[in-house]
């Protein structure tokens, strides 16, 4: 199901734990990591699709999560032609298909980590997972999705604690904040390693 511009409706899911860390899933047989996501089927609302995808990819049920917020509008990314040529998908007519348009949901896990089951379905999307900081560096995400991830995280950050939002305003964009924090921690650990010698 494509819209008039060639985008497939889709949902993206940012799942938080109690420490505001996010679920990060490793694609089966690949070295790329991503948030859960999936297509909206005919007749489904974005929320219904989100719950279905959450169950299919992560094994969670509606009672395991609380919806905190969602993006106001669709966020789009184009899939590069060379990537489409490598796929053997017959579901989407390549001549018309441009990419995905996504509504992103921010969820809080109210269940347990043990409720996460990557093999809930016969064909799992992920073969490993971990909790990572909200402002995760996106190098492990396939290149053409990175901008949409930055947009989604930036928009969904408004639902986080006031303290995190104030840091964002004081120190630039959320990604700038994370990268400066990450770089600062690397510098500190290098200097402490040197002083230990």
From Swiss-Prot:
**Enzyme Commission number:** 3.6.1.-
Is Hydrolase given among the entry's keywords?
A: yes
Keyword presence, ATP-binding: no
Highest taxon, organism lineage: Bacteria
Q: Which cofactor does it need?
A: a divalent metal cation
Q: Which UniProt keywords apply?
A: Hydrolase
Which enzyme class, named as a word? hydrolase
Q: Where is this motif: Nudix box?
A: 38-59
The stretch of residues making up the signal peptide is none
Q: Name one GO molecular function term.
A: pyrophosphatase activity
Tell me which residues make up the Nudix hydrolase domain. 6-154
The family classification in the record reads:
Belongs to the Nudix hydrolase family. RppH subfamily.
The entry's function note states: Accelerates the degradation of transcripts by removing pyrophosphate from the 5'-end of triphosphorylated RNA, leading to a more labile monophosphorylated state that can stimulate subsequent ribonuclease cleavage.
Protein name according to UniProt: RNA pyrophosphohydrolase
This protein's species is: Polynucleobacter necessarius subsp. necessarius (strain STIR1)
